[in-house]
């Protein structure tokens, strides 16, 4: 089967715009970097698609689907709120707030600005047994990866014993999005990076608010 690159990738569009605007005197290094990154991104995507791991198809497909609408993280937050005492409730609220902030930033300004098209799974060789529903939103950045990372960082800051398991779970979700073919690797890396930053900021704000309440009481 002949494999074709996805049509009109965003990094190629940006590179073409820079070349058209500045010509030979333009930022040639930036143009080269954009095209190189896009090429590497698609090569890694293909490499994941070609992994001989059929035993992972069903588990990772289910992980990817279950992570829709941040269901795992809301479930963890509910358990913490119900059984984690005062500290667990604070961690749950902080984690949910981090998801809210991150989801807004990723799904509004970032996806609208990026306009990256979703991968062409058929052309890029992703086995149909791995497929989940292809979202209609822009591909860059990954909202699933962003929310997972934000929740893990925010809750992990309040409850350090959960830091490793939550971040591990977030990594599995991020990988599942590439494995099932709905995101390029750069999408999940960017999403996770945004989630780490916003999750950390949310945790800091929550800690300061808690400290102020403690002083005032």
Residue ranges and their predicted role:
Residues 98, 102, 106-107, 195-203:
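Alpha-helical transmembrane segments of multipass membrane proteins
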Residues 55-56, 87-91, 120, 159-165:
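Membrane-helix interface segments
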Residues 2-74, 107-137:
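N-terminal transmembrane-helix/juxtamembrane module of multi-pass inner/ER membrane proteins
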Residues 106-117, 180-190:
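Acidic (Asp/Glu-rich) catalytic motifs at the cytosolic membrane interface
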Residues 126-217:
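Membrane-embedded catalytic cores of phosphoryl/pyrophosphoryl-handling enzymes
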Residues 80-105:
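Interfacial segments of alpha-helical transmembrane regions
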Residues 80, 106, 110-115, 156, ...:
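Membrane-water interface at transmembrane helix exits
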Residues 75, 105-106, 151, 168:
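Hydrophobic/aromatic residues in alpha-helical transmembrane segments
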């Amino acid at each position: 089967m002949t494999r074709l690159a996805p049509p009109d990738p965003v990094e190629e569009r940006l590179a073409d715009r820079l070349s058209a605007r500045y010509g030979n005197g333009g930022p040639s290094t930036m143009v080269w970097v954009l095209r190189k990154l896009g090429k590497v991104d698609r090569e890694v995507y293909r490499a994941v698609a070609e992994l001989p791991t059929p035993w992972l198809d069903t588990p990772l497909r289910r992980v990817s689907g279950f992570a829709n609408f941040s269901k795992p993280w809301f479930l963890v937050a509910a358990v913490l709120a119900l059984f984690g005492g005062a500290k667990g409730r604070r961690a749950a609220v902080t984690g949910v707030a981090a998801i809210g902030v991150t989801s807004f930033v990723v799904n509004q300004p970032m996806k609208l600005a990026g306009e990256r098209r979703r991968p062409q799974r058929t052309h890029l060789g992703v086995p149909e047994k791995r497929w989940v529903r292809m979202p209609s939103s822009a591909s860059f950045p990954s909202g699933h990866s962003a929310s997972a990372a934000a929740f893990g960082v925010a809750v992990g800051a309040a409850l350090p014993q959960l830091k490793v398991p939550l971040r591990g779970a977030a990594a599995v979700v991020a990988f599942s999005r590439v494995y099932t073919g709905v995101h390029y690797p750069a999408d999940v890396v960017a999403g996770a990076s945004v989630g780490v930053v916003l999750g950390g900021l949310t945790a800091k704000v929550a800690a300061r608010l808690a400290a102020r309440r403690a002083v005032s009481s």
